A protein has these predicted regions:
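A general structural signal for well-ordered alpha-helical segments in protein cores
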Residues: 27, 40, 59, 63, ...
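Residue-level detector of anion-binding/catalytic polar loops
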Residues: 90, 109, 123-125
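Short glycine/serine- and small hydrophobic-enriched flexible loop segments
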Residues: 64-71, 120-121
Length: 146
């Protein structure tokens, strides 16, 4: 009797239907991309293929960066802001009390704590060029339970 080995098959949907892992991005990450800061290529490499999330304060923060650049005569900031607005980033409402508690716990600004809070809520990694926020995220996200 001859026993044949079964063939293993995997059927996959087209790429646009595949789940993209979530990633919380802060203003430093987005600014690096859209204003072509020296670290933009690193930021792009880290976020490609990810589903991007941010607290809704991101809009005001990126607008603030653009305004500062425009006041310094950096006219390219207008295009960068338009690019930021056009990006697919899921914006989330904050839990102000939870954000304030994280800000106190890790000695962060409320703005930075908002990104940390969202990463914890989504159980997702946080992308930032801010060393203090990154360290708080390393500590806090490691304490989360599945």
């Amino acid at each position: 009797m001859i026993v044949s080995t079964p063939t293993f098959h995997v059927a996959e949907p087209p790429a646009q239907y595949l789940h993209r892992p979530p990633l919380v991005v802060d203003c430093s990450t987005l600014a690096g991309l859209v204003f072509r800061e020296p670290w933009w290529a690193d930021a792009l490499a880290r976020i490609e293929g990810r589903e991007l999330h941010a607290p809704n304060i991101l809009q005001a923060e990126i607008a603030n960066v653009a305004v500062k650049k425009l006041r310094r005569g950096e006219t390219h900031a207008t295009e960068g802001l338009a690019q930021a607005v056009a990006m697919e980033i899921d914006l989330h409402r904050l839990d102000a009390e939870a954000v304030a508690a994280l800000a106190q716990r890790y000695n962060l600004s409320a703005s930075d704590a908002a990104y940390l809070w969202l990463a914890a809520e989504l159980k997702a990694p946080l992308a930032t060029f801010d060393a203090k926020l990154a360290e708080a995220a390393r500590v806090h996200l490691a304490t989360l339970r599945g």
